[in-house]
Amino acid sequence: MKLSKLLFVLSAFCFSSVQAENLSIATGGTGGVYYPMGGGLAAVLSKYVPNMSATAEVTGGSVDNLNLIGTGKPYVGFSMADAAKEAQMGEGKFVNKKVDLRTLLVLYPNLMHVVTVESTGIKTMKDLKGKRVSTGAPGSATEIMAFRELEAAGLDKDKDVKRERLSVAESVNAIKDRKIDAFFWVGGLPTAAVTDLANSPGMKIVMIDNADEVAAMNKKYGDLYFPTVIPKTIYSGMAKDNKVAAVANILVVNANMSDAEAYQIVKTIFDHKLDLVRTHQEYINVTLENQKTKSTPVAFHPGALKYFKEKKLNLN
């Protein structure tokens, strides 16, 4: 009897340990920035956190990631701040499916790319009227922000453009095949798919300024967006710096994640930042100084706050 009880206890312990080890990183499409960053994060967590096995998953982007987190399963997700706010509030794409989120980290800014090629003649946001335009993949934060950009520019997403819903990689291929005229993509620098387009023979890339739309977007949706620049050195063939709208990227989890696990993830990211930078240069922008409550609409996880307190960090 004693032996059977012991075996039962050991079996239960082993089962719970296995469950605790598995963690999924919800990223984005293979042509974007979330995917390589998520792959790097999975590798670092698996290597340095005892008894943790993390795996990166290809997804449609922020909205998909937030829905996955909403299942309550062990997910860490990359998300844009505007999409996370909708999920937290149960608004927009998250009506009747509110997600109880917590922020682990403020990551880096996502910059809105409005991309075309010289042969289309498109030079401004207004020039998109009547054109074939991809506003991003279904289930992506690109789509949320693209709709807001069009609205702020005085364009109706359903009436004024011939809209496609493609990932960034699909959008690049569609531009090359002349099936669309322009596309929206919000991501880090550089984005591999956009680099591919810029380096394609016979294609001269044109990046459309969209920073003027920031004020109108913030007036309607809250202070989520800010103007910045994509330097002309980022993508081959750019004629000038590109003035764009940007939004913070955040790393989020379900509020049910334990304080200990959240703490360990945040600590490992900062302890092994150099390893992460080798997977994508946007990790350079993940700094303690950028961890501010004003940068995320979602409260920080208590486990993250414990780490920041140890570092004597002021979040205000």
Provide a role label for each language-model segment.
Residues 21-137:
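Short, glycine-/small- and polar/acidic-enriched structural segments
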Residues 41-51, 92, 143-161, 176-179, ...:
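Ligand-binding cleft/hinge of the Venus flytrap
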Residues 23-24, 44, 94-100, 108, ...:
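Hinge/capping helix and adjacent helix->loop/strand transition within the periplasmic-binding protein
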Residues 15-20:
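Sec/Tat signal peptide C-region and signal peptidase I cleavage site
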Residues 70, 78-94, 147, 151-154, ...:
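A ligand-binding cleft/hinge motif common to bilobed small-molecule-binding domains
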Residues 56-67, 156-176, 188-192:
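Short helix-initiation/N-cap motifs at beta->coil->alpha
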Residues 268-316:
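Extracellular/periplasmic juxtamembrane helices and adjacent flexible linkers that interface
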Residues 204-264, 299, 307, 315:
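C-terminal lobe and pocket-closing loops
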